[in-house]
Amino acid sequence: MPKIGNIELPDFPLLLAPMEDVSDPPFRKLCKEQGADVVYTEFISSEGLIRDAAKSVIKLDIYEKERPVGIQIFGAELDSMLQAVDIVEKSNPDIIDINFGCPVKKVVCKNAGAGILRDIPLMVKLTEEIVKRTKLPVTVKTRLGWDNNSIKIVEVAERLQDVGIQAISIHGRTRVQMYKGEADWKPIAEVKNNQRMHIPVFGNGDVDTPEAAVKMRDEFGLDGAMIGRASIGYPWFFNEVKYYFKTGEHLAPPSMQERVDAARRHLQMAIDWKGEKLGVFETRRHYTNYFKGIPHFKEYRMKMVTSDDAADVFDAFDEVEEKFGDFQFA
């Protein structure tokens, strides 16, 4: 079974990917309840932590019941990253993860995230110094390379392992691809098959069905899957994959009652965490998937995603429960 440092994981663990404005404490808690083995925070700016920016600091919050949990940081300045590690440690996470994969322009233009894939020596140096700075296990999330002409992920993964990381998660696209086209898992399998590699190698990108997870495990031989977009508004995905692993059959989708209950809990936890205004705003992105597949649903969805008043959103949940309570999801 794979391990991250001293953290023992089940065979082929399922990890919740760090996603900006998605993988916050309320959502992580729901995913953990539904079978996620490891969860990661949203990515956190090292510069923001040093400035004590409220938007960055609040992302350090952890629920005890979501462990093991990793806090992910990004940046390209060594001093800032090391200071950020010191701040992160005070929140007592189980793992520190370094983001070398975010393709967003505002991150890349600062040579952070996937931008650092243009400077592998700096990538390795930052990682080495962070590993030295902390007693926590350090992991890395990255991409295949900057573009198709610079894919050196086998070499990069080996060098990162050599400076002490405890696991690596690789998204099967380059930075130039962003999220377009299909994820290519073959280079990730090459990393895993490198005889020098002994740390867990997790695959990421297009793991959007139980069958895809089985393929990643059985055909590509990876150690686990990091789940991102497939989980947004659908925390049940983790248990569905695990059920498919055990039985070869699909778990019945959650009922309308289960979806409404989860949406209510999600919103209430978000309000308790960040207050009504932000709680209402930041849960909006989940509702489309919570209730995906219901015909003639636009009126209710619009109410959920446009109202600034929590009471109105809760009322919308009640209306959905009453009107569509007997709807059977395929």
Residues covered by each model-derived region:
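Flavin-dependent oxidoreductase catalytic cores
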Residues: 1-330
